């Protein structure tokens, strides 16, 4: 599975069954939630110095007596490891300091003592620096922790607002489309209130996920734009529910969510028909 860091500094590939999980700020954590075999973490740092990456490797080799120079794929690294005990179980943490140009990476892989670190080395081999100013094609990747947080925040605001204004429950089912529409049509929100309209779009998107099997949240990276969207069974059917609502409101066009739901459902059914043929 491909991962592109927020801001587009780097990309990497991680195993299909692995997922990204919330971690400390500026650190990205990946592991298999169903069959845990270790935690892989990566942090990236950028500096104005063009040889910053090499400086970091040299510094690690100088200051850490247990570090040694190794090659992982095309990457020069300073590698070290340590073994520790936690709650009666022994673990080993492997560390790599990697650098190139003005970027430095710190990677770690913590797993039970005696475990195989090759999966972490494969991830490091896949690591690529995305060049500043280079035009990359639009990519769709599994939804990142960043966008999950944005979706949750937007949905929480929209659902709370709808329940407060209508004094009705909101369970993210098809029947709730009318409630979103009622609040959108109430005149309480002005076209320039982008956050509100996009949040209503996210709430609509949540209904699409709940009502259409195979519809899932993804992250779209398109140049400098990075946003949550919906993709149907890995097909070309891609929906940006936040933009769907806000762009219509901004252009003073009618936004009928029931009609949009029916349209998207037809398109999803057409995708399934194509897959069967």
Predicted regions and their residues:
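Secretory pathway targeting signatures of secreted, lumenal, and periplasmic proteins
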Residues: 2-55, 59
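A recognition module on extended beta-rich or small alphabeta surfaces enriched in W/G with H and D/E
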Residues: 229-277
């Amino acid at each position: 599975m491909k991962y592109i860091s927020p801001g587009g500094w780097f990309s990497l590939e991680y195993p299909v069954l692995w997922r990204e999980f919330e971690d400390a700020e500026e650190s990205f954590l990946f592991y298999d939630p169903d069959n845990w075999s270790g935690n892989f973490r990566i942090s990236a740092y950028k500096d104005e110095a063009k040889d910053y990456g090499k400086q970091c490797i040299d510094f690690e080799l100088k200051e850490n007596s247990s570090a040694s120079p190794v090659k992982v794929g095309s990457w020069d690294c300073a590698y070290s490891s340590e073994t520790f005990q936690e709650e009666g179980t022994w673990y080993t943490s492997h560390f790599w300091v990697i650098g190139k140009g003005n970027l430095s990476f710190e990677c770690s892989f913590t797993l039970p003592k005696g475990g195989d670190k090759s999966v972490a080395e494969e991830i490091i081999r896949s690591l690529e620096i995305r060049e500043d100013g280079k035009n990359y094609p639009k990519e769709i990747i599994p939804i990142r922790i960043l966008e999950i947080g944005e979706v949750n925040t937007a949905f929480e605001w929209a659902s709370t607002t709808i329940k407060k204004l209508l004094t009705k429950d909101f369970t993210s089912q098809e029947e709730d489309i009318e409630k979103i529409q009622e609040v959108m049509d109430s005149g309480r929100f002005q076209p320039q209130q982008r956050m509100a309209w996009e949040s209503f779009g996210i709430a609509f998107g949540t209904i699409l996920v709940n009502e259409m099997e195979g519809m899932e949240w993804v992250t779209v990276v398109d140049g400098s734009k990075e946003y949550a969207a919906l993709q149907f069974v890995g097909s070309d059917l891609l929906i940006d529910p936040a933009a769907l609502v806000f762009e219509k409101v901004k252009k003073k066009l009618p936004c009928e969510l029931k009609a949009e739901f029916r349209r998207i459902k037809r398109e999803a059914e057409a995708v399934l028909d194509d897959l069967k043929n």
